[in-house]
Amino acid sequence: MKCPFCNFEESKVVDSRATDDNTTIRRRRECLNCNKRYTTYEKIEDFPVLVVKKDLARENFNKEKIINGLIIACQKRPVSRKQIEDIAYEIEKSISNRMVTEIASKDIGEMVMDKLKQVDEISYVRFASVYRQFKDINTFLEEIKNLVVN
């Protein structure tokens, strides 16, 4: 690995430790040429998961799309950015744990709704209205009835 200060290619590891979530190793290195220290991170390469859309098109899974959808659904609601990121992280982790190469966008949408329902019911209804393409007020009322019953 090249030193970011002098581009020398040899270094020694001074310290190694796992990050809090145990998915990455943080290493402190010292350049054998200029003796400056720098940090590197080592992570297992993820296998890309493809999302199968309604029209059967495929695209790489993108956690940011989940975060953006949640931000819109949670606007002006008491849901923090951290809660939104936690939901997206939990969904990403759940998909990764399935060890699949493809997942239907429908399944991801259902996961988002399940998590969002536990955090804020208004945000859940907002997300569901877009995701399930509510056609009229009766569809909203039906979803709210289901929410109250459960």
Curated annotation (Swiss-Prot):
Gene Ontology process terms (BP): negative regulation of DNA-templated transcription
Any idea which UniProt keywords this protein has? Answer: ATP-binding, DNA-binding, Metal-binding, Nucleotide-binding, Repressor, Transcription, Transcription regulation, Zinc, Zinc-finger
Give start-end positions of each zinc finger (unnamed): 3-34
This protein's cofactor list reads: Zn(2+)
Return the cofactor note field. Binds 1 zinc ion.
Q: Name one Pfam family in it.
A: Zn_ribbon_NrdR
Name the PROSITE patterns for this protein.
ATP_CONE (PS51161)
Q: What role does this protein play?
A: Negatively regulates transcription of bacterial ribonucleotide reductase nrd genes and operons by binding to NrdR-boxes.
Family matches, as PANTHER family: TRANSCRIPTIONAL REPRESSOR NRDR (PTHR30455:SF2)
Q: Which family does it belong to?
A: Belongs to the NrdR family.
Record-given protein name: Transcriptional repressor NrdR
